UniProtKB/Swiss-Prot annotation:
Encoding gene (name): csrA
Primary location group: cytoplasm
Protein name, entry field: Translational regulator CsrA
GO cellular component, one term: cytosol
Entry's localization field: Cytoplasm
Keywords carried by this UniProt record: Bacterial flagellum biogenesis, Cytoplasm, Repressor, RNA-binding, Translation regulation
An example molecular function term from Gene Ontology annotations: mRNA 5'-UTR binding
Alphabetized InterPro entries for the sequence: CsrA (IPR003751), CsrA_sf (IPR036107)
Keyword Cytoplasm: yes
């Protein structure tokens, strides 16, 4: 792990496309701004962990549940086309 020391107003570059801005340091809190391409996900770590857990849960969902949901969508689409 690379550890850097920065003061308020200074920046850190990650690759060619990502820049971290140290906006404010107040006590034990640091406000950071992130400039990144639109396609790059930027999340607080605890939010990222929840997203990963939800993705794993969805990927391991019971096949019968998925088939039932697909059947409901088919029924809804048939009603719309009538």
């Amino acid at each position: 792990m690379l550890v850097l020391t920065r003061k308020s107003g200074q920046r850190i570059s990650i690759g060619d496309d990502i820049v971290l801005h140290v906006l404010e340091i107040k006590g034990t809190q640091v406000r950071i701004g992130v400039d990144a391409p639109r396609g790059v996900g930027v999340h607080r770590f605890e939010v990222y962990q929840r997203i990963q857990a939800e993705n794993q849960s969805a990927a391991s969902m019971d096949q019968d549940v998925l088939s039932g949901a697909a059947g409901l969508f088919e029924q809804l689409n048939l009603k719309k086309t009538k």
